[in-house]
Amino acid sequence: MKRLFWNLKHKKAWLVLLLGTGMILSSCSNIDQSFFRELSVESVEKNTAYNQLPVNSTTFRNLVFGTRSYNDGNYVVVIATETDSSQINFLNGSTNQGTSSLSWGGTLGTTIRQVQNRYSTYPNGVKFLIWNDIAPGSVKWNPYARFPVVDRKNELASQEDKDNSNKLRRSDASAVRYREIVDFIQRTYGGNVANLINQSNVHAQTVGNDVTKAIVIAFRKDNLNKIRANFYGLDNSTNPNAPGSGQGDSTPPASSGEGGGSDGSSGGDSSSGNGQNTTPTSPQSSQPAVQRSQKSYGIKQHAVRVSVDFLNFLDSVYTPLN
């Protein structure tokens, strides 16, 4: 009898361990996948549909850390969702939802045309990569949108409303990926991106409310072979080194948080800026403090502006030679 209980106890322990491991793997599943699409001048001019853009082979983890394996470290990463009106405008120049086939008539496409031959000091110019959250169905809720908070003692509320109280509205693969992306960027760059989510609109009942902002990170390799990460909408006077630019080997941070999940995982490659696994153990503490721009980082003053402002931002990143 004792042996039977011993076996059951240890089988249960192994089951818990396996389940826990599965949870960790699923929470990081999207981070080591390759899903960003290359947006070129040719694609903009031909109005190539988003889902027809070529997928780049670099993993999301390495792109966010800053890697010289892609265009020698000189590239712009754009993360957006079709669920927020300001982000739709940034991409295609309108505020209409349901933009799975983007026209690239907004600030992003206009600026890509303008910089085609602008940065001649870079042999291959500056490359643009984009991933866009596309909500299934006709109702376009932001990946962070939640159901209203309902008191379970409220006799006027339906049981369905009580059951859904404060839960995330979306659990589709695109929403899960979007939340993992934002979570990973926040963990990697800490306070620099603390206000990506507008908490006051998370429970908004109007589809299209701006819950998150378009995330634009411009990476540049300087003359010391360090890759700098520059956030559009921030005061970039103190550009932090990207985690992949020569900060030594360390253990990757776990990406967790509500809304994480798995739609499959590839191992990805472990190389970042200096050809080694240079993920910081404590990404928030490894980055120097960056002062937020009062005029550009509030949710009401979107990171989406007229194209000349975005062009000025890119000029400030890629024109310096130091």
UniProtKB/Swiss-Prot annotation:
Residues 235-254, 274-296 have a biased composition (Polar residues). It is a lipid-anchor. Keywords: Cell membrane, Lipoprotein, Membrane, Palmitate, Signal. Residues 235-298 are annotated as: Disordered. A lipid is attached at C28 (S-diacylglycerol cysteine). The keyword Membrane applies. Residues 1-27 form the signal peptide. InterPro entries: DUF6856. Residues 257-267 have a biased composition (Gly residues). Pfam families: DUF6856. This is Uncharacterized lipoprotein MG348.
